[in-house]
Every structure is written in C-alpha cells, then in structure tokens.
C-alpha cells in the first residue's frame, strides 16, 4: 500500500509591513508587493517604489504583520 503524502497548504509571499518614514518618523502600514507608489501621510515623502513585482521600500521596516 502507498502511504498518502502530506499535503502542504501554500502560503502567500506577500505581507503587510509597518514602515517608519526616514524624514518625519511617522509609522504607516503598507503592502510588500505594492504596485503604486506609497507616500507618507504626514510629509508626503515616497516610502515605496513599485519595481514590477516586489516593492522597493525606502523607509525603515519596523514590523512584519501577519
């Protein structure tokens, strides 16, 4: 008899991140695979640049959520 192999459940590679703005220190939640540039809500500095797939994060990642 063949044993049944354990079926792994796929998990997404994308996450939500808590990012700190390098200019004003404001913390904001962003998506790791953002397709649109994200600006800081306080000072307007771009925190994330779209790079086609995974976004390039300019600010400091404080926490990975989820």
Curated annotation (Swiss-Prot):
Disulfide bond residue pairs: none
Any single GO CC term annotated in Swiss-Prot or TrEMBL for this entry: cytosolic small ribosomal subunit
GO molecular function: RNA binding; structural constituent of ribosome; zinc ion binding
Needed cofactors: Zn(2+)
Keywords assigned: Metal-binding, Ribonucleoprotein, Ribosomal protein, Zinc, Zinc-finger
Subunit record text: Part of the 30S ribosomal subunit.
Protein name, entry field: Small ribosomal subunit protein eS27
Originating organism: Saccharolobus solfataricus (strain ATCC 35092 / DSM 1617 / JCM 11322 / P2) (Sulfolobus solfataricus)
Taxonomic lineage from the root: Archaea, Thermoproteota, Thermoprotei, Sulfolobales, Sulfolobaceae
